[in-house]
Regions:
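Mixed-charge, low-complexity intrinsically disordered regions
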Residues: 2-136, 145-204
Length: 204
């Protein structure tokens, strides 16, 4: 799973539309291709979700204001966990329950997709197994280490299975073997991006 996240800087002092006199965004007139998701239907849902939840990231509630740059107006990157709908649902449920506050990816995935690594402060919209937006999270820390150096604390933070390091290694080895880019093979010293995050919406 690649986290190609579009950062959105929170500004508690950002004026609302009434104060600024700016025209509010109308989702019906916005180009879905500007939203960082793969299909127009999901793009429309993501826009609506972002409009309703961006206040939880410290931003004004209105989703987009005419006149801003594209980088300031598009929602954060929207993505789902795992490589199949059932896994996406299970891991999303763990986030919504407060059990999952971390995720990990192979560094090679970012190289293969020519995608930037996540950084602290970036926002993401989490999709369920049917590509509907369900949660807004903010990355709090990112560390690149090797598979065999991931520790018990991080394994527990991933909130999967019995939350032990042993089960983390078994599950993620199987996942990486299924999903590594062509030409890459699993090894205990392969580089892994370990990302921690906080749930902004819905609030626990």
């Amino acid at each position: 799973m690649t986290h190609d996240v579009n950062p959105q800087a929170a500004d508690e002092n950002e004026p609302n539309d009434a104060e600024s006199g700016a025209e509010s965004f109308d989702p019906a007139t916005f180009d879905p291709e500007a939203v960082p998701v793969e299909d127009a239907e999901t793009a429309a849902e993501v826009l609506d979700f972002w409009a309703a939840t961006r206040q939880y990231a410290g931003m004004a509630k209105a989703s987009i204001v005419v006149g801003q740059t594209v980088g300031e107006t598009v929602p954060p990157q929207a993505w789902s966990f795992g490589d199949e709908p059932e896994l996406a649902e299970r891991l999303l449920d763990a986030v919504l329950a407060g059990d999952k506050t971390a995720t990990s990816s192979a560094l090679w995935d970012y190289d293969s997709d020519d995608a930037p690594l996540p950084v602290a402060g970036e926002l993401s919209i989490l999709l369920d197994g049917e590509n509907h937006p369900r949660a807004l999270i903010r990355t709090t820390s990112v560390e690149t280490t090797t598979f065999d150096e991931v520790d018990e604390d991080f394994a527990a933070a991933e909130g999967e299975d019995d939350r032990t390091l042993e089960s983390w290694r078994a599950g993620h080895e199987a996942y990486f073997r299924r999903n590594l880019p062509e030409g890459r093979e699993f090894s205990p010293d392969m580089p892994v991006v370990c990302e921690r995050f906080e749930l902004l919406y819905p609030r626990l």
